[in-house]
A protein has these predicted regions:
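Terminal helices and disordered tails flanking the catalytic cores of nucleotide-processing hydrolases
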Residues: 1-109, 265-301
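Helix-turn-helix-type domain boundary/helix-start signal
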Residues: 36-37, 152, 185, 210, ...
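Divalent-cation-assisted or electrostatically stabilized phosphate/pyrophosphate-binding catalytic cores
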Residues: 183-204, 226-301
């Protein structure tokens, strides 16, 4: 039986929710039964380190299509975009063979939405960023990366891979992010460990799902590195960091600025723009904060 078991991917389990299947160790010994409710971050950590599960085989018709070619309105399609994102991330964490096709289809869907309705897409970020869920935040990262990448001058293929990275880089944080954002307490050591490990855990989940594009994985790996070498997980600095990773980092930072958390209020857009303008001073490639400011304009949608 142990040969049929696979590792539990980051993002597959959530604190406070029942296990969707029995969990085994590497030798096939049962650790926890289906339905057990995970209570703590340390339990979640142990399951990611030791846990295995037996995947269910599901037959799918070959003609199933993942890309929708309809003209897009971001407000009308908001629910569909979030549902598609959640389904895609679940496909990755469950190592579904359709995961890569779903991710590419979602990237095309989001890029098409941004291309057809740029002002509405940016307005959606600003209107819905007051107290967003983790899935909403991830969607906002994808939207902002789309616009910054093109303003910065990335070629189309690299820009699409950046969108894919934006949608998956925080996969390993999905189980705990909403809980962390709603807490006004100091982070525990376990919580800090989850945060610092999430880039590499997200990469592990992508690889396990058959998503192995080297540039995509490098963007995910580097999106919390800092130009001064103080970032994680590798402590890279300066030109060692991909511009795509800096674009994703800035997108996440901007969404954090305009988002309310339990421990602080959100910035208004004018304040956020002023802070972004200071980030060209050694924290990012100067052209990247400038690109975001150009995307936003003097009066963002």
């Amino acid at each position: 039986m142990s040969n049929s078991l696979i590792r539990i991917a980051p993002g597959a389990l959530t604190i406070g929710k029942p296990l969707p299947w029995d969990v085994f160790d590497a030798e096939g010994n049962i650790l926890l039964r289906q339905g057990y409710v995970i209570q703590t971050n340390s339990q979640l950590e142990q399951l990611f380190e030791r846990g295995r599960f037996k995947p269910r085989k599901i037959e799918r018709p070959k003609e199933e299509v993942f890309e929708d070619l309809r003209q897009r309105n971001p407000f009308a399609e908001y629910g569909d975009l979030l549902t598609t994102l959640e389904v895609t991330l679940n496909a990755i964490t469950s190592e579904d063979p359709t995961a890569q096709k779903r991710l590419l289809g979602l990237c095309r869907m989001l890029d098409k939405t941004c291309q057809e309705a740029p002002d509405a897409s940016l307005a959606l970020v600003h209107l819905y960023s007051i107290s967003p869920t983790i899935h909403e935040q991830i969607l906002f990262y994808g939207i902002l990366c789309h616009f910054i990448a093109r303003q910065f001058g990335l070629e189309e293929k690299r820009a699409t891979l950046l969108t894919a990275a934006a949608l998956t880089a925080n996969l390993a944080l999905v189980p705990v992010a909403d809980q962390l954002n709603a807490s006004n307490k100091v982070l525990t050591d376990d919580q800090r460990a989850v945060i610092r490990k999430h880039p590499l855990r997200s990469i592990d989940a992508l690889k396990s799902a058959g998503i192995s594009n080297k540039l995509l994985l490098r963007i995910v790996a580097q999106h919390h590195e800092q130009a001064d070498g103080s970032g994680y997980p590798e402590g890279l600095s300066g030109g060692e960091i991909l511009p795509e990773a800096e674009i994703l980092a800035l997108s996440e930072r901007y969404v954090a600025m305009i988002t309310k958390r339990a421990y602080r209020n959100r910035m208004n857009i004018t304040e956020a723009r002023k802070l972004i303008a200071t980030l060209a001073d050694g924290k990012f490639r100067p052209a990247i904060p400038r690109s975001l400011l150009q995307v936003l304009g003097d009066h963002p949608p």
